[in-house]
Structures are given as C-alpha cells and as structure tokens.
Amino acid sequence: FKVRLLTTGEYEIEEQAYETLENQLVGQIPISKFFDAKAGVRFDTPEGPDRTYALLGIAGLAPQWFEVDANLYVSKDGDSSAEIDAEYELLFTNYWILSATLDATVAFSEDEEIGVGKGLVSTETGLRLRYDLIDRAFSPYVGVVHERKYGDTADLAKAEGGGTEDWFAVIGARIAF
C-alpha cells in the first residue's frame, strides 16, 4: 500500500496566475503485477469555483511499456467525469528521456460554471524532453503540448470568447521522493 500526493498546474504568464491547479491525494494497492487500484480525493482550483471530487481508478504498465492512468471522478454536487492518460517513454540515454503523452477527458454531466460540457471534453497530446538528475528524483523538462476542446465544452469556450484549440510550450520539473 502506498499513499501519493500528485499535483499539476498551468500557469498563465500574461495573467500572472494559475489557470488550473489540480491536487490529488490517493492510496494505491497492487491488484496485479503491473497494475494498482487507487482511491482518494482530488481538489481543483480552476478559473471559477473550486471543485472537490472523490476518485477511483487504476494505474499501471500496459503491454508495450505504456504507462496508463484511468480515473473516475464524482463531485460533491454529483457531477461525474472520467479521464485516461497514456504515456510512453523513449530513452535516448539513461538520463535523457523523451515522453509522449495523450490525455482524454469525458464528462457524464455538464458543469457550466467551470466550462465543462457533457461528452468528450478535451484531449491533450504532448512531448517532453527531460534530464534525470539525482537518482531520477529530480528531472527538469521542456516540451510542447497541443490541447483541443470538443462538443459542448468547445461551444461553451466559444461563447466565453475563448478558443477550442491551442499549442503551449511547457517547462517544469518532475519530482519524486
């Protein structure tokens, strides 16, 4: 059994504020040689009201060495969604690693306050080049990400004057201890 704290965020340089900030506290238990079941809580601080979700999911290593993370979320208001993340790492050396990622989110109910429509919400594809330091505990990275919104979520974004598709340069660090 292990407990993990996962945090990811998007910082808008022009606005000098976080666009999104997602925090998860999960407990994981092995269910097979390559997969863990997990349960926990997720706390989001998007543009608009904060959201708290219960989380159930699985994470592990699929055939062909793809890392997979699939989660089901239910908010205290009953809004539910699912997310699947897949990542493949290509090792150039023991320290230089290129990661290709694909994330997809589906909402089972609409939440207009945070701009989420029912159905396929968004996909995000990306490439990150990182350099593992200090026994892989600290890994700075640079990369590029393409994000696209679909269906009702795209309609809500357009109504607010936003776009449905964007490219981002990313820089950050992966920290594990």
Segments from the language model and where they lie:
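Outer-membrane beta-barrel domain signature
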Residues: 10-16, 42-47, 71-75, 112-118, ...
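Outer-membrane beta-barrel "beta-signal"
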Residues: 127-133, 163-177
